[in-house]
Amino acid sequence: MYCPFCNAEDTKVIDSRLVEEGTQVRRRRECLKCQERFTTFETAELNLPRIIKRDGRRSAFDEEKLRAGLLKALEKRPISTEQIETAVQRIIHKLRARGECEVSSQWLGELVMDELRALDEVAYVRFASVYRSFQDINAFRDEIRRLQKQQKKSHDK
């Protein structure tokens, strides 16, 4: 690592500590040339797949956009911030676990709907209405029927 004071290449680590709940390493370093000390922080770079949009464009995964979509669907619903954050982390974990460089926005949308279905059925229908572009009340009715059939199947098991 280069010294930020004299640009020398040789530095030594004096102290290392885990910070940010173990997700980051704080290192205290000393330049071997000018003896100045400085601090560096290291975090693992965990690449998430790029998202392939319906029109074929590709964009970086945006965690804030995911969170905003969940928050919008769950607005005025009895779901805690912790539950929302857990859902966000589950979705991110599934994205990473898939192990691909790119995933379709449709696949990601289905993941979001699965999480919402488990959290709150009203939020699920809200999100589905936008995601699937419901045009009329019949589309809502069909989605609610599909949801009820899934519930019945899971209760019968």
From Swiss-Prot:
Keywords: ATP-binding, DNA-binding, Metal-binding, Nucleotide-binding, Repressor, Transcription, Transcription regulation, Zinc, Zinc-finger. Its cofactor is Zn(2+). One of its GO terms (molecular function) is zinc ion binding. The keyword Metal-binding applies. It comes from the Bacteria. Binds 1 zinc ion. One of its GO terms (biological process) is negative regulation of DNA-templated transcription. InterPro entries: ATP-cone_dom, NrdR-like_N, RNR_NrdR-like. Transmembrane segments: none annotated. Residues 49-139 form the ATP-cone domain. A zinc finger (unnamed) spans 3-34. Belongs to the NrdR family. Negatively regulates transcription of bacterial ribonucleotide reductase nrd genes and operons by binding to NrdR-boxes. This is Transcriptional repressor NrdR. The gene is nrdR.
